[in-house]
Structures are given as C-alpha cells and as structure tokens.
Amino acid sequence: MSLPMMISMLVQALYNIVDSIFVAKLSENALTAVSLAFPLQTLLIAVATGTGVGMNALLSKSLGEHNYKKANKIASNAAFLYVCSYIVFLILGFTIVKPFYKSQMGNADMQIMEYGIEYLSTVMIFSFGLLAQIFFERLLTSTGRTIFSMTSQLCGAITNIILDPIMIFGLLGCPRMGVTGAAVATVIGQCVAAIVAGTCNHKFNHEIKLDFHRFRPDAHIIGTIYYYAVYRFCHDLLHEQNPHRFLFYSYSRIWCILQASEFLLYASIRSEQRYNTYYCL
C-alpha cells in the first residue's frame, strides 16, 4: 500500500515542476509570476488535504467497526465541507488575488503582476477540480484502494504534461494562451484526476456510498473532522515549508522590487527542494 502513496506524492510534486519548465520558456517574468502564487496555492492544498485527513480518521474508525451507515454519513458531511471550501476559494479568486500580488509587487513590474493574476485567479476560481480530486482520492485511501488513488493522479499529471505545451505555446491549432494556458492545463488535469477517482469510487469502493437524500450537516462530525484536519493543515503551512514559506512572502516583496532574476533563482531552488523532499518521503 505504501508504494502507490509514494508515487502519488511524487506525481503531486511534479505538477509544479512541469508547469515551471514550460512557463520558464515564455519569459523570466512569467516564471516569477507563477512562483509568487505559491503561498495561496499552499493554502488551497492545505485546506483540501487537511479536510481529507480529518475525514479519513473518522472513516477508518467507522469502517473498522463495520458501521457503514455512519461511514456514509461522514463521507457526505466531508463532501459538504469540500463544497463550502470551494465557495470560499471561489470568492477569494475574484477578490484577493490582485491585492495579494500588489502587496508583493507594488509598482515594481506590472507584467509580472498581470501574469500572476491570470494564473492564480484561474487556479482558485476553478479549484473545484483539485478539491474533488483530493476528496475522492481520500475516500479510496480510507478503504485501502491506494492503487486507484495513484492511477487517478497519474492520469491528471499526464493530462497536464500533454496540455501544457499545447495551451501555453498554441500548438495543434490551440490559441496561444501563455501563463493562462498553464493554469488551464493544470485545472483540466485536476478535473481529469477527479473524474477518474470518482469513477473508481463508484465502481470499486463498495463500502462507502454517498447519499444526500434528506442530508443535514452534522455539527459533531464536522467539528471532529476539523479537529483532526487542523494538524495536517498546520503541517502543510508550517512544517513542510518552514521557515521558507513565511519568508517567501517577505522576500518576494523585496526581490521583485530589486530584480526579478534573484527571486527567480530562489523560487527555482525551492521547487527542487520540494521535489527532493517528496522523493525522500
């Protein structure tokens, strides 16, 4: 069971690396803009994975007790939380992205800000693909079907790798979309992974059935999910990137004012460090 999880983590790390490789061919400013999106992207992933960890903790107990009715209720409440999370990130995608980049860039380079707003807005507004992907993958993991979780991530990553050059550079009749193309390719890859994971759940995950007939949110279940989720949430925000994640925002405000190339070098090193960390895990 551990090998599929290791491959899944490696594939997740490759998403950012592949995007960076193709975006770097556009310009230095394009890669800098994408790198500046890391803090909010980390927040998005932390919320999604944290909720998944909380859901898995409750599901494991219920499935161990063969209490499938309660397991279905837990899964339905978790799905409700993912929908609520998407609504929050949808609103943030429309409201916070421009102030977020402006707080880092000031008036240093408007092209970087323009690229960044295009990229991050697309990723956050259409984050339903990522949230659905992680939700269905966590359901598969909770019942030990990690091979299907790995398969869904591979499908999403391969889709992203194929679409990145096509949408960024305008190949095969597709209009040249630049940085926006990288974001669209990522979103499509996430949606493909979500569809594959959802299909695998429907066909193979017989222990858990999502049922929203007469559904009512359960405050106790939701509270317990977030009780366990907060540990993973803090891990993703603090431990995995500590101390670089918090310094990243501060450094970007300085380096983008001085010269983009210094910040670009730092961002590239951080991407490789993330890859090495996932590989070691």
Task: Please place each PLM-identified region on the residue numbering.
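Short alpha-helical transmembrane segments in multi-pass integral membrane proteins
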Residues: M1-S2, L59-F128, C174-Y226, Y279-L281
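Alpha-helical transmembrane segments of multi-pass membrane transporters/permeases
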Residues: K69, Y82, L139-I166, T180-V187
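Generic alpha-helical transmembrane segments of integral inner-membrane proteins
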Residues: M6, L10, L14, V18, ...
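Small-residue-rich hydrophobic transmembrane alpha-helices
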Residues: L31-I91, L130-S149, I254-L281
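Hydrophobic faces of transmembrane alpha-helices in multi-pass small-molecule transporters and flippases
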Residues: S2-L10, L120-M124, I147-L154, V196-T199, ...
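Helix-terminus/linker motif at the lipid-water interface of multi-pass membrane proteins
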Residues: L10, L14-T32, Y101-M110, I166-R176, ...
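Hydrophobic residues within alpha-helical transmembrane segments
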Residues: L3, I7, A37-L40, F80-C84, ...
